[in-house]
Amino acid sequence: MEIKNGLCTQKYTKVYAEDKEKWKFNAPHHFIVGKADCEDEYIEPIEYVNFQEGPIKEYGINGVNNEDLILMVITRLQAFQDSPYKCRENAMAITKLQECLMWLGKRTLDREVKGIEGTSEI
């Protein structure tokens, strides 16, 4: 299925994920970034992104996690900030992405305190 968001342009690329009925653990795990000028049934992949499927303690490490991708984007934007391409918008995006990491880290810490981090327990 194609992933759409009103805040993202799809002028050059489109993002796809498996259909909802194929989701495991309540979320999509497999994404394709494809060229926007292709028909949906003929996606020309640029890159594949596979997220962790299931808790690590139960399934081992089998994909990237949210924090990995956020860290990549922060690193990329920070490199632009250290160049002539520095701008307010990049600085704001970095701040918000760092905030994302903080909240995801808090979720992890809360689960560690409960003794359920890395498991499917709620």
Curated annotation (Swiss-Prot):
Keywords in UniProt for this one? Nucleotide-binding
* Substitution effect: residue 90 to A: No longer binds 2'cADPR, partial loss of anti-phage defense activity
What does the annotation give as the result of altering residue 90 to E? Answer: No longer binds 2'cADPR, complete loss of anti-phage activity
Q: What GO MF annotations does this protein's record show?
A: nucleotide binding
- Where would you find the membrane-spanning parts of this chain? none
Q: Which residues bind 3'cADPR?
A: 52, 54, 76, 80, 85, 90, 107, 111, 118
> Domain comment, in the record's words?
Upon ligand binding the C-terminus changes conformation, enclosing the ligand.
What does the subunit comment say? Homodimer.
Add the further remark from the entry: Although 2'cADPR has been crystallized with Tad1 (AC P0DW58) we have chosen to show 3'cADPR binding here, as evidence suggests 3'cADPR is produced by ThsB2 (AC J8CSK2) and 3'cADPR activates ThsA better than 2'cADPR (AC J8G6Z1). Encoded in a prophage region of this genome.
Primary role: Blocks activity of the Thoeris antiviral defense system (ThsA and ThsB). Binds and sequesters the cyclic ADP-D-ribose signal molecule (cADPR) generated by ThsB (AC J8G8J6), ThsB' (AC J8CSK2, probably 3'cADPR), BdTIR (AC I1GTC2, 2'cADPR) and AaTIR (AC A0A1H7VGH3, 3'cADPR). Sequestration prevents the signal from activating the Thoeris antiviral defense system; heating cmTad1 bound to the signal (95 degrees Celsius for 15 minutes) restores the ability of the signal to activate the NAD(+) hydrolase activity of ThsA (AC J8G6Z1).
Family to which the UniProt record says this protein belongs: Belongs to the Tad1 family.
Q: What is this protein called?
A: Thoeris anti-defense 1
Instruction: Please tell me the species this chain comes from.
Output: Clostridioides mangenotii (strain LM2)
